[in-house]
């Protein structure tokens, strides 16, 4: 016997988190951080053929203070890493990061001293998108998966703990120069 029985039909019960998640997922404002060829595919996804506006991402923001999702598209150089972190820090909470392409995810074919081997060494990444470069359809699919993640993400201390865990894991990660692999 709860409150559900006392309410008239047609009244929807939900949590504030559920409602806020539903609203947040429908109004992503992306900050574009296009660094290489993946940025061309990202721009294509905003055009009339693919129309990201259908998913609430109508305008790519030039200001990080107006954005809540950062799409890092392409390789990140060592000199660009502090700028990327500064832009991430300027974004208001809650914020999410999508690493678009192999270069943003793992450094790609640029396994050298000048390129960061994965943007997750600089900012916490919520979604990785493979491909070189990934097609606009793949970007839209990743955004829809990020929508689902955002809708079911708990607010407040839970999200802060998740970000702290991601940043700690990135700082503890072994530098790529010390890893043994195909290119070493």
Curated annotation (Swiss-Prot):
GO molecular-function terms, A-Z: 4 iron, 4 sulfur cluster binding; iron ion binding; NADH dehydrogenase (ubiquinone) activity; NADH:ubiquinone reductase (non-electrogenic) activity; quinone binding
Cofactor list: [4Fe-4S] cluster
Compartments where found: Cell membrane
GO biological process: aerobic respiration; electron transport coupled proton transport
A Pfam family annotated for this UniProt entry: Oxidored_q6
Binding-site residues for [4Fe-4S] cluster, renumbered to this chain: 37-38, 103, 132
GO CC annotations, alphabetized: plasma membrane; respiratory chain complex I
Signal peptide, first to last residue: none
Top-level class of the enzyme under EC nomenclature: translocase
Assigned keywords, A-Z: 4Fe-4S, Cell membrane, Iron, Iron-sulfur, Membrane, Metal-binding, NAD, Quinone, Translocase, Transport
Manner of cofactor binding, per the entry note: Binds 1 [4Fe-4S] cluster.
Catalyzed reactions per annotation: a quinone + NADH + 5 H(+)(in) = a quinol + NAD(+) + 4 H(+)(out)
Record PROSITE patterns: COMPLEX1_20K
Record protein name field: NADH-quinone oxidoreductase subunit B
Organism: Nocardioides sp. (strain ATCC BAA-499 / JS614)
Gene (UniProt): nuoB
């Amino acid at each position: 016997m709860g409150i559900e029985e006392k309410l008239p039909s047609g009244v929807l019960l939900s949590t504030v988190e559920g409602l806020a998640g539903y609203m947040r997922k429908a109004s992503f404002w992306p900050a574009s951080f296009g660094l290489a060829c993946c940025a061309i595919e990202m721009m294509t996804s905003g055009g009339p053929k693919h129309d990201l506006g259908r998913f609430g991402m109508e305008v790519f923001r030039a200001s990080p203070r107006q954005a809540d999702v950062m799409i890092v598209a392409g390789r990140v150089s060592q000199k660009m890493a502090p700028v990327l972190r500064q832009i991430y820090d300027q974004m208001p909470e809650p914020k999410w990061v999508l690493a678009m392409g192999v270069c943003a995810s793992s450094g790609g074919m640029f396994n050298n001293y000048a390129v960061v081997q994965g943007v997750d060494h600089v900012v916490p990444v919520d979604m990785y998108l493979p491909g070189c470069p990934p097609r606009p359809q793949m970007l839209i699919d990743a955004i829809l998966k990020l929508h689902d993640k955002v809708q079911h993400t708990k607010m407040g201390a839970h999200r802060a703990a998740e970000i702290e865990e991601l940043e700690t894991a990135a700082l503890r990660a072994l530098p790529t120069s010390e890893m043994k692999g195909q290119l070493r």
